């Protein structure tokens, strides 16, 4: 329903949202980024290293993205103590669980690659077990700007072929639904089959 008249609250002018501060806010954010980059130098501007994870839900689980932090299992497999990891630029998420071997191996390899490239300027050289450079080298070290060790997504190659009758009759969505239902009921069906077998033996 449309009305030609303006249906406003009383004193509505006092509650109008304005965006006059937007350009200044943009400038403030940029200056803050620059100050932070100087403060954390020679550490990378992108911050800590994040793991490669799959998105949640059926819609996004085929896509990989950066996660919150490496799991304790991944750190252990890579031989990095969990207390040391945050001090050398590795994000840690103690709540994350590894649900697949492939995911675990991918992130362990990522940590090992980082260890191969990592250079540490420790406060106390005697306590570090990693590659150490003298403090004077810290002044000449260059800072990495932007993403480092970026996630490389696989590009699937398309193969063209003729559309066959079998392809037209195949209902992909229905097939996926059936397989998902089978997966959900597998436990109950196995239990029922075991009970039926037990009854037959009697």
Curated annotation (Swiss-Prot):
Which GO cellular component terms, listed alphabetically, does the Swiss-Prot or TrEMBL entry include? cytosolic large ribosomal subunit
Cite a single GO MF annotation.
structural constituent of ribosome
Tell me the GO BP annotations in alphabetical order: translation
Keywords of this entry:
Ribonucleoprotein, Ribosomal protein
Which one Pfam family would you cite for this protein? Ribosomal_L13e
Q: Which domain of life is it from?
A: Eukaryota
Q: Which family does it belong to?
A: Belongs to the eukaryotic ribosomal protein eL13 family.
Name this protein carries in UniProt: Large ribosomal subunit protein eL13
Read off the lineage from the record. Eukaryota, Viridiplantae, Streptophyta, Embryophyta, Tracheophyta
């Amino acid at each position: 329903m449309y009305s030609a008249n303006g249906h406003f609250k009383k004193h509505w002018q006092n509650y109008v949202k304005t965006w006059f501060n937007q350009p200044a806010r943009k400038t403030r954010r940029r200056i803050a980024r620059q100050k932070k980059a100087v403060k954390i130098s020679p550490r990378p501007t992108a911050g800590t290293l994040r793991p490669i994870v799959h998105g949640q839900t059926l819609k996004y689980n085929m896509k990989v993205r950066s996660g919150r932090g490496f799991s304790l299992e991944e750190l252990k497999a890579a031989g990095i103590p969990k207390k040391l990891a945050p001090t050398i630029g590795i994000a840690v998420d103690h709540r994350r669980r590894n649900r697949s071997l492939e995911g675990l191996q991918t992130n362990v390899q990522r940590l090992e690659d980082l260890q191969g490239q990592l250079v540490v300027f420790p406060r106390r050289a005697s306590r570090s077990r990693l590659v150490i450079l003298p403090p004077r080298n810290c002044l000449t070290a260059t800072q990495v700007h932007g993403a480092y060790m970026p996630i490389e997504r696989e590009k699937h190659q398309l193969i063209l072929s003729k559309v066959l009758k079998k392809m037209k009759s195949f209902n992909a969505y229905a097939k996926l639904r059936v397989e998902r239902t089978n997966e959900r009921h597998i436990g109950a069906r196995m239990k029922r089959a075991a009970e039926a077998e037990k009854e037959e033996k009697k």
